[in-house]
Each structure stands twice: as structure tokens, then as C-alpha cells.
Amino acid sequence: FKKYSNLKIYAIDLPGHNKSSKLDEYSLPIFKKIIEDFFEKYKNKRNYIIGHSLGALLAFELAQTVENELQGVFLEEPGWLDEFPDIKDFGPNPFIIQNKSKWKTPIDAINNYKELDPEGFDENPYKASLTALRFYINDIKISTNFDFKPQNYQNIAKSLSIKIYVARANLEKGGMIPEQSKSKALESNKSIVFKEFDTGHNIMSESTDEYFEFVSEFLNHSTDI
């Protein structure tokens, strides 16, 4: 932390997901506008942004708009898919939609979520409980009304001159960057640095040390440290 204390490093995540009051609409353009205002107000040429999954897509969209305020963008598993499933069918959302109205307390959510992920509770009950609590707090509209369209990542990549690092997971374990998408991104911007991880979609959780080595490489490469 001391080494990078002179930098401004921001983890980009989705407003409304436990981090703000409920929103009228959940979409990347809405999220982007909220965070753009922050960077326009607090100008600093040494900003770095990092995002995971939808947060990575948001960070990449944001980079195109506020590039002059950034040194680099680090993307963990952006969903660079040509087609994206309906949000109501994605991940645990069918279970949440069916059961959330029954959760009167956080304990209800934890006990019910055990039915969906018994292995997760056996392996790491603390982490699994936190996941259940996140779903308990989240606005139900995040699971039912999220307006999402595939990202035009090629155009964004082509437009950027800042450093771009991408952490890519194993497709067979739940990764969301197909080989074709990786190739298209590199065709658009040959300076993008990809690193492959033999993990599922949550690289930071599954391969923490290797993940942070890659983040350090990104920060060192993007600065004069």
C-alpha cells in the first residue's frame, strides 16, 4: 500500500448493489453517468480504475469517456459476450426471484441460500453467508430489470491509448471472455495485456496472490514507480 500511496486507485462497482440507495433504473449508461460526474469534479491525471465482471464493463465504458483523467484500466473478467442471457435467467437470479419475498431477516436469506449452494457453505460458510446477505440487501430489480446489452468492446479498445490489462478466467470453469472475443479485442488494440488464470469467474477470490501480482504489474507498467 505504501508503494502506491501516491496513486488514486478506484474500484468501479455498480451503484445500487449495497453501495447506494435504490435506483429507478439499473443499466450501464445510468451507472456510467453517476461515476463520470465524480471524475469531472475531482480531476487527477494519476487515476487508475479496476473492475470485475459488470464492474469491469462499466470501467471500460467509463475509460472511453474520462480517458484524459486516467493512466490505466484493469479489467477482471469483463463479460465480452456477443449474446448475454436475460438477466432474470443469469446466475442465481432465478432462485433469488423465486425466494427473496420470503426473506424477512438476513438469517432467512442465509438458511434459504444453503439450498442453492450447499457446497459453498461446506467449503467456506463465512463467504457463502456474505453472498446470501448481499442478495438479501440488493434491490430485487437488480435481478429482474437490469437493462443490459453486449458491450462494443472493440470500438472502446480501438479508441483508448491508456494501458489496458485484462484478467481472463478458464472458460470451462465459468470464464466470460471467449477466445474469439479476446482475439477481437487484440485486433482492435494490440497493446492490451491479457493474463490467463485457471479459475472460475471470480479470479481474485480463487487465485488471490497471482491476481495481485498482475495488478502490481499493471500499476508498475502504467507509472514511473
Label every model-predicted segment.
Residues 85-86, 100-159:
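Conserved alpha/beta-hydrolase catalytic His-Asp/Glu region
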Residues 164-199:
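Conserved loop-alpha-helix segment in the C-terminal half of the alpha/beta-hydrolase fold
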